[in-house]
From Swiss-Prot:
Protein phosphatase that acts on XA21 pathogen recognition receptor. Negatively regulates cell death and XA21-mediated innate immunity. Disruption phenotype: Enhanced resistance to Xanthomonas oryzae pv. oryzae (Xoo), expression of defense-related genes and cell death (necrotic lesions). CDD domains: PP2Cc. Residues 308-320 have a biased composition (Polar residues). It is found in: Cell membrane. Residues 227-630 form the PPM-type phosphatase domain. Belongs to the PP2C family. Residues 295-341 are annotated as: Disordered. Residues 323-332 have a biased composition (Basic residues). Mn(2+) 1 binds at residues 262-263. This is Protein phosphatase 2C 35. The gene is XB15.
């Protein structure tokens, strides 16, 4: 597993939900405790990569922001949480892949998580009803808190406690009975995330030459050249219902990749994205964001005209698609066949790091507007080629597995390199930046703060960096109707062909080509008029240069915004970190979604989470949230 486990108790007093985080509590000793609700995880940057910061610097830094726009601002910590509402469904191809003893566990796990050593993670565990811990009042709800509150820490977050690598075996005696069961359950829950790629590769060998799918050895070598896990690459990936989350961090190169994939109609498209999109992004960006000693890369993707944030770009469809071969770190022998079946990151390798170029020689090459556009175009190519590979392989299997034509996913991908942040999205997931307004600086410096949320002046503004692609956006509705003038039902029941709320998506072939619609059972077919696609996978793109005004970034699936506006989400994180600097802001947002959903339905927290998966989808969607702090200022952004 690699991730260190810790769990703390949080809850609300009888008077409300404020101050839910209290003293530590042990994990339940019951080895069968549920981890299907979701998970919380974090990554805190090692001290050597962090610029020292004190609370007194906030106002001075903010006032100097305009003069320091070119100053690099890097992330300090990553907080993530995911909550499942949908029932877990097996991969369509699982009958080809799973051994009998694996199929049951894989099909029923609604949540799973796996990571390298520098991430810490725990399952979301609700505080028991009427339990009394270190405080006298009973808890009214909430989760045992996430990994940002570690050990018996009572003060602000100490980064040294979470600087990697984290020991995977250092657990207290109170947790000894729970940890082995937790690891077993997480390993079973993660198996589905690697099934689809392996099945499709095996099934399509008889349809395609090996060149069509690329050389696995060449793909593995490319990953090794990027600085794999033994040389500092850290990763995390997990699932919650139909959502998938993927994080890759390279401290040596100074970049972080985050992917949030909000699937629909099944897990195959999202699992394919987890297995392949990062690999494609890395391949397309080679030579743009880093140099490599062994290969001279020609900059043949330069745009003709400069620009910093085009909305969509077309994909070059000439290059061949490559695939990664799974490799894994050494573990105690369990049999070669069994080892092959374990879920593991695509890029994690056993390799000799001595031939890698030193970090100081891996230079950031994006230094002009043209370079930023080239990076955005490279992200688009990576997405399009990933979808082409998915649809091409699924096309060979659609006769046997017609449901593959229904499956798709929204895509939100963020790449941060130094002070440059690149955002790509398809669908209705969002990236929201919390930034400080200069007009509020004088109020902040003159205001007082006595520890209560109500006395904290609103410091930050919410800036949405993505575009929503759904029928709720009038421009998208007009575009689809203009593209299908002969089809009055192109948009019906506030959905594309009465089926899909989003107007752009990865996969969902039945809305892109008539042949995939015809492959479906009659009850699932739409009335496909003409041959033009109803939806596309053309992303919206954005480049943003971070400044000292920027405090944190919220990346999330649309489940968060069922109960929050952008401004409310930023305000919730801002107030939470002001009152609980050692807390987990992503988990707090997920918790608030449940409280708001329960309140809307006229029930309490525990009544809601006791509703089975699937039925609970009527009250809230799957929710995946990642909060990235910038220069550590998230922890003192409103002092």
């Amino acid at each position: 597993m690699g991730n260190s486990l810790a769990c703390f108790c949080c809850g609300g007093g009888a008077g409300g939900r404020g101050g839910r985080h209290v003293a530590p509590a042990a994990l339940p000793s019951d080895p069968a405790y549920d981890e299907g609700l979701g998970h919380s995880f974090c990554y805190v940057r090692p001290d050597k990569f962090v610029v020292p910061f004190s609370a007194d610097d906030l106002v001075a830094d903010a006032k100097a922001a305009a003069a320091a726009e070119g100053e690099a601002t890097t992330f300090r910590a990553i907080s993530g949480a995911a909550l499942s509402a949908n029932v877990s469904t097996p991969l369509s191809t699982s009958v080809l892949l799973l051994m009998p003893e694996e199929s049951s566990a894989s099909a029923t796990a609604s949540s799973g998580f796996e990571s390298s050593e520098s991430f810490a993670a725990v399952p979301l565990q609700p505080v028991p009803r009427f339990s009394s811990g270190p405080i006298s009042a009973p808890f009214s709800g909430g989760f045992m808190s996430g990994p940002l509150e570690r050990g018996f820490q009572s003060g602000p977050l100490d980064a040294a406690l979470l600087s990697g690598p984290l020991p995977g075996t250092a657990t207290s005696g109170r947790m000894g009975g729970a940890v082995p069961a937790l690891r077993r359950s997480l390993s079973h829950g993660g198996r589905r995330l690697r099934n689809f790629t392996r099945a499709l590769l095996a099934r399509t060998e008889k349809f395609q030459d090996s060149a069509d799918l690329g050389s696995p050895d060449a793909a593995a070598a490319a990953v090794a050249a990027c600085g794999g896990d033994p040389c500092g690459l850290q990763w995390a990936q997990g699932k919650a219902g139909e959502d998938r989350v993927h994080v890759v961090v390279s401290e040596e190169r100074g970049w972080v990749f985050v992917g949030i994939y909000d699937g629909f109609n099944g897990p195959d498209a999202t699992d394919f994205l987890v297995s392949n999109l990062y690999a494609a992004v890395h391949r397309e960006l080679r030579g743009l964001l880093w140099d490599q000693r062994e290969q001279n890369v020609q900059h043949d993707q330069r745009p003709d005209q400069p620009g910093s944030a085009p909305s969509t770009t077309a994909s070059d469809n000439q290059d061949q698609w490559g695939r990664r071969r799974r490799t894994r770190r050494s573990r105690p022998p369990r049999g070669a066949d069994d080892d092959q079946r374990r879920w593991k990151c695509e890029w994690e390798q056993e390799r000799d790091c001595s031939n890698l170029k030193p970090p100081t020689q891996q230079r950031l090459r994006c230094n002009s507007e043209n370079d930023h556009v080239a990076v955005l175009k490279a992200l688009t190519r990576a997405l399009h080629r990933t979808e082409e590979a998915y649809l091409d392989i699924a096309d060979k299997m659609v006769g046997e597995f017609p449901e593959l034509a229904l499956m798709g996913s929204c895509v939100l991908a963020m790449l941060m390199k130094g002070e440059d942040m690149y955002i790509m999205n398809v669908g209705d997931s969002r990236a929201v930046l919390a930034t400080m307004d200069s007009v509020d600086l004088e109020q902040i410096s003159q205001g007082s703060f006595d520890g209560s949320v109500g006395d904290c002046p609103p410091c930050l503004s919410a800036v949405q960096l993505t575009s929503d692609h759904s029928t709720s956006v009038e421009e998208e509705v007009i575009r689809i109707r203009n593209e299908h003038p002969d089809d009055p039902s192109a948009i019906s029941k506030d959905r594309v062909k009465g089926s899909l709320k989003v107007t752009r998506a990865f996969g969902a072939g039945f809305l892109k080509q008539p042949k995939w619609n015809d492959a479906l059972l009659e009850m699932f077919r739409i009335d496909y008029v003409g041959s033009s696609p109803y939806i596309s996978c053309n992303p919206s793109l954005f480049h943003h240069k971070l400044s000292t005004r920027d405090r944190f970034l919220i990346l999330s699936s649309d489940g968060l915004y069922q109960y929050f506006t952008n401004e409310e989400a930023v305000a919730q994180v801002e107030m939470f970190i002001a009152t609980t600097p050692e807390g987990d802001p992503a988990q707090h947002l997920v918790e608030e979604v449940l409280f708001r959903a329960a309140n809307k339905a006229g029930m309490d927290f525990h009544e809601l989470i006791e509703i089975p998966h699937g039925d609970r989808r009527r009250y809230h969607d799957d929710v995946s949230v990642i909060v990235i702090s910038l220069e550590g200022r998230i922890w003192r952004s409103c002092v």
